[in-house]
A protein has these predicted regions:
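Short catalytic micro-motifs in class I SAM-dependent methyltransferases
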Residues: 116-120
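Class I (Rossmann-like) S-adenosyl-L-methionine-dependent methyltransferase catalytic domain
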Residues: 1-107, 121-137, 142-211
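A conserved beta-strand element that flanks and buttresses the S-adenosyl-L-methionine
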Residues: 113
Length: 211
């Protein structure tokens, strides 16, 4: 899918549906928060939530005193909703409207978090473009936390096909500069009560990249 088409799709989703009317909504992003703590992130760590949308991860990070938080999403509408929810706290966050496959990072991050964005990239060229941006944006010693549908997870979401992953396949895509350090399976309950199987994979950058 081309970047313009991808953006149009998600603008349509977020202008028609409320925050808790999408399957990936979480009142409490506990798995992500646990892994961010697990990798040793501190309030001074630079964290980017890629495809963050209206996720409440940003609220929790700000409330915990994190001072360098960025949320990237290609939907203007969903970031506006997130800012409105945060109120005055929104000023403590860097907001980027961009497609992660064409965005050009201007700084380096300690933690790259992506829950339920990467698995929508079904074409190899888009995955390669995403990884190229990630490669330029993560410090040596930094961490990548990616949550995708697991191998037994859904094959489609929000009207689009997805790619399901296990940690080994993600490692192949990321390349030898990244070392797998943790994996966790998570069963997510959608707002309407169905279960979705997610795979959280955590990688550390061992070489290359920014310092």
């Amino acid at each position: 899918m081309q970047s313009d088409s991808r953006q149009a799709h998600w603008e349509g989703v977020y202008t028609k549906k409320g925050e808790n009317e999408v399957s990936w909504f979480q009142e409490n992003p506990a798995p992500s928060l646990e892994l961010i703590a697990h990798v040793g992130a501190t309030p001074a760590s630079a964290i980017i939530d890629v495809g963050g949308g209206a996720s409440r991860l940003v609220d929790n990070l700000v409330d915990r005193g994190f001072e360098d938080v960025t949320v990237l999403d290609l939907s203007v509408a969903v970031l506006a909703a997130a800012k409105a929810r945060l109120g005055s706290r929104a000023a403590q966050v860097q907001w980027i409207v961009a497609d992660a496959t064409v965005w050009e990072p201007v700084k380096a991050y300690d933690v790259w978090h992506d829950r339920a964005a990467f698995h929508f990239l079904t074409e190899e060229c888009d995955r390669a473009a995403y990884v190229a941006r990630l490669d330029r944006a993560i410090k040596v010693g930094g961490y990548i936390i990616i949550a995708t549908f697991a191998l037994d997870g859904p094959e489609r979401c929000s009207g689009l096909p997805v790619v399901r992953y296990d940690p080994a396949r993600l490692g192949e895509i990321l390349g030898n500069s990244f070392q797998l350090i943790d994996t966790r399976h998570h069963t997510h309950a959608t707002p309407w009560g169905s279960d979705q199987s997610f795979q959280f994979s955590v990688f550390r950058r061992m070489s290359g990249g920014r310092s």
